[in-house]
């Protein structure tokens, strides 16, 4: 997908995507520590700015990064979604918000929120608990571990991997799962799916959780990618639908 031709910043408003926005000092003194979050946006539907600001502020505080006021985040997001609608109509986009140089930078890429291509997911062991610094680093522009995981899985024909310790399905390493069960629809990966719901792309009847799910209870499954595109799941290891 092609990156949208414009970006939005809390300091300077809208700019063309080729415009330099970040100082060399910011790149050299804090590489990989800039707080970031990715979310889907739909023109005409305001993102949950308060929740996004809290998410960004936690890692900013941990790494000693100056956090802009919530009003600056709201303005940058509003400018972006308004411009998205003006240029592209009711087009859904996946947006990346980065805090750098004491400002908010918003960029995005158009997506198709519902995809027909089925995906295969690998099975894996539950990753060991991460120390707090690694949990916070995962919320920044330091994406080496995620990119390595994506490459390794793609090399084996898998889009993601699902922990299956004790015979239960856990939250995927990269994305999220939405599963049909006899008791209703369940989403594994509450934080990511909460952003999908906030954009109006997931129904409110789906129960969001990070608790493991019994595989035998799953009658059908969908995978939500890191880009918030939802695919039908063909298999998780030897489990097939």
State each model region's role.
Residues 164-171, 224:
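Short, composition-biased local secondary-structure segments
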Residues 168-189:
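Glycine- and Gly-Pro-enriched alpha-helical subdomains that act as flexible
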Residues 1-162, 181-185, 192-241:
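Conserved alpha/beta cores of soluble small-molecule-handling proteins
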């Amino acid at each position: 997908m092609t990156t949208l031709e414009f970006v939005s910043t809390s300091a300077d408003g809208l700019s063309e995507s080729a415009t330099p926005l970040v100082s060399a000092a910011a790149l050299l003194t804090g590489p990989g520590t800039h707080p970031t979050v990715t979310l889907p946006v739909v023109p005409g539907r305001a993102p949950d700015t308060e929740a996004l600001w809290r998410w960004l502020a936690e890692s900013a505080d941990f790494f000693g990064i100056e956090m802009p006021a919530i009003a600056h985040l709201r303005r940058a997001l509003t400018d972006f979604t308004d411009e998205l609608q003006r240029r592209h109509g009711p087009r859904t986009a996946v947006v990346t918000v980065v805090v750098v140089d004491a400002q908010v930078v918003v960029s995005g890429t158009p997506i198709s929120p519902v995809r027909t291509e089925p995906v295969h997911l690998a099975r894996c062991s539950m990753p060991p608990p991460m120390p707090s610094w690694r949990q916070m680093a995962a919320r920044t522009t330091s994406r080496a571990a995620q990119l390595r995981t994506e490459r390794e899985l793609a090399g084996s024909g898998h889009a993601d991997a699902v922990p299956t310790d004790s015979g239960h399905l856990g939250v995927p390493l990269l994305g999220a799962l939405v599963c049909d069960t006899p008791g209703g629809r369940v989403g594994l990966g509450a934080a990511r799916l909460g952003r999908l719901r906030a954009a109006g792309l997931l129904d409110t009847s789906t129960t969001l959780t990070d608790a493991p799910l019994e595989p035998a209870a799953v009658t059908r499954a969908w995978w939500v990618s890191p880009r918030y595109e939802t695919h039908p799941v063909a298999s998780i290891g030897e489990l097939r639908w």
